[in-house]
C-alpha cells in the first residue's frame, strides 16, 4: 500500500507561506525554503517592533512636550514635576497632542502647573 502524505495539507501549508512572502524581493517570494526563512524573520521583526513602537511613540511625545515647554520658558522635566505636584493628570500622548494642535491651551496648562 502506498504511503499517504496528505498532499492537501502540505499544499495548503506551502501556499500559506508563499502568500505571506508575496511581494518579497527575488527568490524570497517564490522559492519555498527561502521564503520560509524570510517569513520567519519578518515575523520576528514584527513581534519585536510592536514593542519598540510603544517606546518610539513615548519618546516622540516627550520631544514634542519638551519643545513646547521650552517655548513657554521651562523644560520637560520641570513641567512634569510641577504637574505631578499640582496633581494635573494628563498623559503624555494627550499633552503632546495639545502642544501641537492648541499651543494656547498648552500655555495655560504650563501656567497652572508652574504658577
UniProtKB/Swiss-Prot annotation:
Assigned GO CC terms: ribonucleoprotein complex; ribosome
S-S bonds: none
Alphabetical list of Gene3D superfamilies matching this protein: 6.10.160.10, Ribosomal protein L20
Family matches, as SUPFAM superfamilies: Ribosomal protein L20
GO biological process: ribosomal large subunit assembly; translation
Entry keyword rRNA-binding: yes
GO MF terms held by the record: rRNA binding; structural constituent of ribosome
Family annotation (InterPro entries): Ribosomal_bL20 (IPR005813), RIBOSOMAL_L20_CS (IPR049946), Ribosomal_protein_bL20_C (IPR035566)
Keywords: Ribonucleoprotein, Ribosomal protein, RNA-binding, rRNA-binding
Function text: Binds directly to 23S ribosomal RNA and is necessary for the in vitro assembly process of the 50S ribosomal subunit. It is not involved in the protein synthesizing functions of that subunit.
Family: Belongs to the bacterial ribosomal protein bL20 family.
Name of the protein in its database record: Large ribosomal subunit protein bL20
Amino acid at each position: 500500500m502506498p504511503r499517504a502524505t496528505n498532499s492537501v495539507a502540505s499544499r495548503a501549508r506551502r501556499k500559506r507561506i508563499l502568500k505571506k512572502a508575496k511581494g518579497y524581493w527575488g527568490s524570497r517570494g517564490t522559492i519555498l525554503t527561502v521564503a520560509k526563512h524570510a517569513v520567519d524573520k519578518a515575523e520576528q521583526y514584527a513581534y519585536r517592533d510592536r514593542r519598540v513602537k510603544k517606546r518610539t511613540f513615548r519618546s516622540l511625545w516627550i520631544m514634542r512636550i519638551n519643545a513646547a515647554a521650552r517655548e513657554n520658558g521651562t523644560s520637560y522635566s520641570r513641567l512634569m514635576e510641577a504637574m505631578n505636584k499640582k496633581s494635573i493628570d494628563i498623559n503624555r500622548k494627550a499633552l503632546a497632542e495639545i502642544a501641537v494642535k492648541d499651543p494656547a491651551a498648552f500655555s495655560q496648562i504650563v501656567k497652572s502647573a508652574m504658577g
